[in-house]
Amino acid sequence: MASLKIENVSKRFGSVGILSDVNLSIDDGDFLVLVGPSGCGKSTLLNIVAGLEPLSSGSISIDGRSVQNLEPKERDIAMVFQSYALYPSMSVAKNIAFPLRMRRQSAQEQAQKVRQVSELLQIGHLLERKPQQLSGGQRQRVAMGRALVRDPKIFLFDEPLSNLDAKLRVDMRTEIKRLHQRVRKTTIYVTHDQIEAMTMASHIAVMKDGVVQQFGTPSDIYDRPENTFVATFMGSPSMNLLPATVQPAGGKLNLRIDGTDALIRMPAHLARGAAALKAGQPVLFGLRPEWFLCGAALPDTHVGLRAAVDVLEPTGPDLYAALRLGPHEVMVRLPADARVCVGSDVDFGVDLSKALVFDRATGVSVQ
């Protein structure tokens, strides 16, 4: 296992900036997920760590040792790609053993390590097959086996599940997490899928336009996003952001939801950051769909509002309702058996103990 430090890493292709002053510190045995939309620079950063792409400035160190001038083979890193990258003419066993052959290990050592890895990944019965005889999930397991057999310091995964169907993605997601729990190797995993990021990571780095927007645990990222990009990118459905205006009353700050009569007291947990807000300042009131309760009887942590039901979306375990609050649409998650119907007005409560406020001009969270 190994720790990894990325300091002030930037990457340019000519006049085009791809990465800008990226700083990340990954502890020994950590599972870091780099997540963001296409073109945000996450795969470029992974390739720089692997040594496949030179950096323009900054430094990469593994266990305190600078590696940016080392060849990929000298960094003791194994990488799993989206496209599997298996040799079609070789059997599964030979594909897995290939890195060991390159290290000139004995046939006995190769056979022993291939057997151990195949048992770990539950592909022992596939060792004599060729890649074209395997399913997508089986091919991905073979690709992981080839990385595992090297026993590297760090594992890199570049969108390994993108080619799989939805059910297989869920299955493989669980397998990769289980594998990490067993081997406890430092891992960096790239994906554009925020569900993969939330379910697999011990830490997440959310990226946009080559800049790390936020680094933290999944709960930090989800419950305390530092800006509106993170708030809306992480979570499905995404966070509701209601335009509002700061309005003092009785020595306290309140939020007036624009275009409505709704007046909401400033959440108490935001008091320190809200002290810098000015009367009349435009903000965004952030609410996740599950931070609502339907009904008139509400706990003290909630404030009541009334809205019209516009659309209902049953998903089985949950019922998502698109509510119309003045000119704004609010997506709310309700129990599957909630008694609401399209066109009706409903009373619902907002959990102020979790609600967030963002500066509308900068998108930065008020905390």
Tell what function each PLM region has:
Residues F31, P72-F233:
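ABC ATPase nucleotide-binding domains
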Residues A50:
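Helix-to-loop junction immediately C-terminal to a conserved catalytic motif
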Residues D223, K252-D310, E329, A338-Q367:
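Glycine/charge-rich catalytic "coupling/switch" loops of P-loop NTPases
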Residues K5, S25, S61, D347-G349:
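ABC ATPase nucleotide-binding domain
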Residues G58-S66:
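Conserved ABC transporter NBD signature motif
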Residues V35-P37:
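The feature captures the beta-strand-to-loop junction immediately N-terminal to the Walker
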Residues S56-S59, E109, D209, A355:
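Conserved coupling/switch loops of ABC nucleotide-binding domains, chiefly the family-specific signature
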